[in-house]
């Protein structure tokens, strides 16, 4: 099982312990995960994606289970070539942070990026939030990704594949039930921020949407990696082993060979 | 599920959740019984020996959650007492009060203790350092009741529907009442936990529960470093999956086994009256 939501590098608004690839490899082994889609955390607040992407590929090179998920911003000159370059270098998914770039839902540039990712057979990886709103720095004014962003991107083309991490039940349901059945099939969600018991939002979503819509994400190094597995372990007895999707299956042609 | 470990859950050592909530038919939710069942079921899966719980009035149905009316306080406490009586082997409870109705609050504590309440729950009805809270703490001292106080970690502004307090406010109250143990609620429950830890460090009669939906890496490590394991209490509040995550994290952040036991249950056993948790003490 692949962790679709991991980063390396420091976080601008607080200290996070050991956000380095070697530590991530040890954590994945401890959690018995086969690998992770890894982004460069500080890049979310950078303007030019290139230095962060270069740092990401260099840092991950020695670690075959850490799969690069670099950032492409479609309002940056030359982004199409940048996308082609990172795909050629082994990117397994493409991160975008439209809320950090001031890009509104339905913006043609984001739609173009979604279509370009589909052409490259890479999932477009979106992050709803890095931290709880209640503890966010006054300087962190981007706000959460909206359901409208996701709905617009899911409607851009039949080959589009979108993975959304860090959403709660409300955003997931608003998006899912605001799409056609075909469009829903283009969107996957991690459940790191979805509440378990006693509210049992996760169990509810599995029942109503289907387990295949969900992938495994931890939000390391920001959050405890134990949380997603705890959510699985506390499912009601009739929902144990729900059969969620392995994010690794969403870009099968490009996953780097794993050590056996 | 292939590829993700489904580990054997820890069932061997005692475990006390010092911050739990139950619902009742006056709580405005038709699924209130399902919520209560889900908490007990998840608690059994995690290995919770005792839930120390409260009912917050009508949870906003007939008066605000954090400003409950006297009638809702009483009705909620009655529901909590009944639930605790029906599950006496695993549920203990706090008497919830609103300090704005001082006479009612004091009478309610006396009444609830007679019904087996083991602590006092204060919400966000009045800021923690307000003198109006003093009579309640004086009664808690006489009755040797711990006080679980709802806290916002580092309040930088007012938030709607609550008169929030933070670690500094609670430290002021605790300094005035050194014989009372105050449980600072949900270190992971929103706001900036990093501010809370130094705010209460020099006030030894404040301990922190680890509950809340927040599972920031580094929070447990810093809590242990600044407060020490003997001032931390494991708890879940509204999200039991985050409680389980933090429980598992306690095993990998380098704590000695004795420290883990302190956080799991021994600190709670020390804070509450002797005999409150007989199944733990037997273990």
Write out the residue ranges for each language-model feature:
Chain B
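Acidic/histidine-rich helix-loop elements
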Residues: 22-34, 61-71, 159
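Active-site neighborhood of phospho(di)ester-bond hydrolases with catalytic His/Asp-centered motifs
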Residues: 15-18, 52-54, 94-96, 121, ...
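Conserved, mostly hydrophobic/aromatic
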Residues: 19, 43, 80, 112, ...
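Catalytic pocket-lining loop regions of alpha/beta-barrel enzymes
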Residues: 117-119, 131-233, 281-282
């Amino acid at each position: 099982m692949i962790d679709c939501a991991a980063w390396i590098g420091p976080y601008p608004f607080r200290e996070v312990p050991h956000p380095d690839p070697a530590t991530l490899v040890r954590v994945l082994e401890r959690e018995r995960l086969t690998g992770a889609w890894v982004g460069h955390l500080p890049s979310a607040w950078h303007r030019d994606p290139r230095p962060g992407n270069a740092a990401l590929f260099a840092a991950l090179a020695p670690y075959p289970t850490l799969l690069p998920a670099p950032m492409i911003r479609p309002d940056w000159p030359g982004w199409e070539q940048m996308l082609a370059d990172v795909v050629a270098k082994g990117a397994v998914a493409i991160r975008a942070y439209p809320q950090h770039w001031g890009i509104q839902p339905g913006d043609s540039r984001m739609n173009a990026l979604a279509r370009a990712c589909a052409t490259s057979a890479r999932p477009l990886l979106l992050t709803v939030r890095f931290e709880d709103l209640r503890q966010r720095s006054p300087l962190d004014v981007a706000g959460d990704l909206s359901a409208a962003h996701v709905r617009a991107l899911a409607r851009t083309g039949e080959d589009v594949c979108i993975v959304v991490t860090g959403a709660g039940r409300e955003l997931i349901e608003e998006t899912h039930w605001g799409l056609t059945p075909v469009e829903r099939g283009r969107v996957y969600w991690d459940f790191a921020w979805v509440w378990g018991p006693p509210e049992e939002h996760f169990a509810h979503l599995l029942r109503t949407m289907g387990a295949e819509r969900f992938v495994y994400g931890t939000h390391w190094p920001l959050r405890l990696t134990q949380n997603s597995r705890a959510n699985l372990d506390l499912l009601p007895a009739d929902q144990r082993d729900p059969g969620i999707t392995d994010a690794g299956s969403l870009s099968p042609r490009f996953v780097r060979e794993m050590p056996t | 599920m292939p590829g993700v470990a489904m580990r054997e859950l820890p069932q061997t050592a005692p475990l006390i959740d010092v911050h739990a909530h139950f619902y009742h038919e006056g709580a405005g939710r038709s699924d209130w019984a399902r919520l209560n069942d889900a908490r007990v079921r998840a608690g059994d899966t995690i290995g919770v020996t005792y839930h120390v719980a409260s009912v917050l009035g009508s949870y906003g149905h007939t008066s605000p959650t954090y400003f409950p009316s006297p009638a809702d306080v009483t009705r909620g406490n009655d529901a909590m007492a009944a639930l605790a009586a029906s599950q006496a082997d695993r549920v203990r409870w706090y008497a919830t009060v609103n300090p704005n109705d001082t006479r009612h609050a004091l009478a309610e504590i006396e009444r609830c203790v007679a019904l087996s309440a083991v602590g006092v729950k204060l919400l966000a009805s009045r800021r923690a350092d307000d003198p109006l809270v003093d009579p309640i703490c004086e009664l808690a001292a006489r009755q040797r009741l711990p006080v679980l106080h709802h806290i916002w970690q580092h309040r930088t502004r007012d938030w709607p529907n609550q008169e929030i307090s933070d670690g500094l406010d609670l430290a002021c109250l605790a300094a005035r009442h050194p014989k009372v143990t105050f449980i600072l609620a949900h270190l992971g429950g929103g706001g900036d936990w990093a501010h809370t830890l130094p705010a209460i460090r020099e006030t030894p009669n404040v301990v922190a529960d680890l509950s809340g939906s927040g599972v920031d890496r580094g929070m447990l490590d810093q809590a242990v470093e600044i407060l020490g394991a003997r001032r931390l209490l494991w708890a879940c509040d509204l999200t039991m999956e985050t409680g389980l995550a933090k429980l598992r994290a306690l095993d990998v952040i380098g704590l000695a086994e004795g420290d883990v036991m302190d956080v799991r249950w021994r600190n709670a056993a020390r804070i509450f009256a002797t005999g409150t948790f007989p199944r733990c003490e037997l273990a």
